[in-house]
Amino acid sequence: MAEYSANAPQTVNPGETVIFTDVEVPCTRGFVRNREGSGDFLLQGWVPNSNVCNCPCSNQNSAIYQTAFGANIAVATGSEVAPISVALAINGTTIPSSTMIVTPAAVEQFFNVSVDKAVPIWRNCCQTVSVRNTSSVPIVVQNANIVFTRPDLNVTY
């Protein structure tokens, strides 16, 4: 498991990523890496026993990271009130089924959003996962938290 957070309010422009400033639980095995001050997480697609035997597990094409994200979001001051949304993205491409949408009635009216999604990372590759503002207006994100776990691994990392 690896956990990252950002409690202070941050303004995230359309198309940009949420920045995570605190490492709550680091990944000690190198499967999840984050550059300090970045919203991008490099996930490694290591699959156990992928080249050892002819069992069904060797045919698994992806490493699955259970990715849980939660935060409070609001329309930023000075922006037009409109529906706002954030979503998980792999290598900059939004995962549509992870989109979290709210419709505030006023600026700075916070809503809690969350998603818990299985994110496939290609075997033996590394891919970048982030949380992106998919709205058409700047938003404020506060108390952001993201957790990555690998259910297929029976050891703690």
Describe the function of each predicted region:
Residues 1-157:
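Extracellular jelly-roll beta-sandwich "head" domains, especially the C-terminal globular C1q domain
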